[in-house]
Amino acid sequence: MPKKLFYRCISYRMNKKNILVISIFLFICAFCFSQKIHPSIEPVFLPEDVLVNANRAGWSLSADEVFRLALLCSECPLDSEAGEKCLLIFEKIKAEVSSDDFMQLELEERGRAVLKLLYRDYLTTYDFHQTRTDVALLTGVYNCVSSGVLYMAAAKAAGLEVRGQKTTEHAFCTVYLPNTSGGKTNQLKKIDVETTNPYGFNPGTRETIENEDKIQSYYVVPKKYYANRQEVSDRIFAGLIAGNLCSYYIEQNNYEKAIPLGAARYEFVLQEKSKAANEARRDLDVLASNYVNTDIQDAKLFSGYVEWFTGFIDRWGMTDYLQKNMDTALYNLLVLCLQQKDFPLAEASFNKFKPYITQKQAATSQEILADIFFDSGLEGLPAEEQIELINQTLSQPQNQDEAFQKRAQHYLENAWLMILNNCMNIRDYETGFQKSEEALQYLPKSSKIKKIQKAFYDNCIAIIHNNFAEQANAQRFDQARQVLEAGMQVFPDDKTLKNDLNLLNRMTAN
């Protein structure tokens, strides 16, 4: 409701106390809406929402656990209308695959029958992007992940040992059966199950599918998509649903949904030591890092993003990937502060976030802090006042950091060069030389000041020599001697002036 309308409706009958309360309320509301609300860093669901025994840390989940995890990874709450409907459907699937008709089948035939059942009653249309299990069940539209996880849950309910397989581009299942053809004792027979099409049990074999006319479309996976396969835990396999959704949300710039979902996916495999679990952690780090690298042009607003990022690090722990992005985030924040000449924010941010950055980035940050401080503090001041302010700053205990001192020397050098260049422009070479001597007391290693000092020196000597020559050529030897003596008081060791004096002595000796 607009504020004016709100006040007009109630102010005529309010006492002062009520007006104060409403004013405070409106102020709080305005303040809240002016703040950026960042994504939650907490998982959108937890293992105890799925596991019958939350202490179980093994790879294998039960059929119900796989299915419940698949629904939650699909962003389908178990108590939602869709969730309850899917749970009822799965109870129906479990009842059929565990019926006497199914259980009397040989294990291999039972695995094939589970896939046929899913295509007979539920899966109808392949869609590369449709990764949600609830949507697959309720609409028949599926992809490799949603159909693969659904098959895993149903096959487990049928008493089969089934494991998930993932590649860079694909996901499918493998059924493990006792080996009845001889060979090593306890060796299992592996049969891949390509769940993207009804002929996918033991790919390469051909068979008749009941109700084939109801299947609108299915997918034949290119052979190259099977390269570099990894066998993964049930948790990882069901979590592929969440991983796909997070990728989609990245494209939509929707980190409010992506980060809590990615956190839930990782929380489920937190204790697992595997390449796939490491990939889940890396994916979560990418989500947070992408968010903190959002293109924000306001330093104060962006500082909130960096603070959020440190909260994420506190919650999930530092990794090499997060460290790199933390260093970058603070660097970007300080650059924004430099552009906006906001030294107080830069200094406060550096002090707050310093525990999260590397020593190398801390040194770089100190240089940027110096740039911000001097760019904002020296602007518009005469060079002499700049030098005074810089020297005062350099003497303060809190500014003894090597990187800060290094940048301060740069600004001090520039201030002195302003003075010296002015002397050069007005051809006041002697004053310029004297000023350069003073400057070198502060900046003894400055090649720029040494270079301009030499120019002053050479010009001074040239002027003295030319004045001497003019007087000597006119036979005004006393004036010529005065010129040399005055010059040698300033430059007593100059060879040119000494040679001129020797020449004058010879000229006047006769």
Q: What is each model feature region?
A:
Residues 146-217, 281:
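Hydrophobic/aromatic-rich core segments of domains that either
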Residues 63-135, 185:
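Secondary-structure boundary elements
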Residues 224, 232-251, 274-296, 322-336, ...:
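Amphipathic alpha-helical repeat scaffolds of TPR domains
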Residues 270-271, 317, 324, 358, ...:
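Short coil turns that delineate tetratricopeptide repeat
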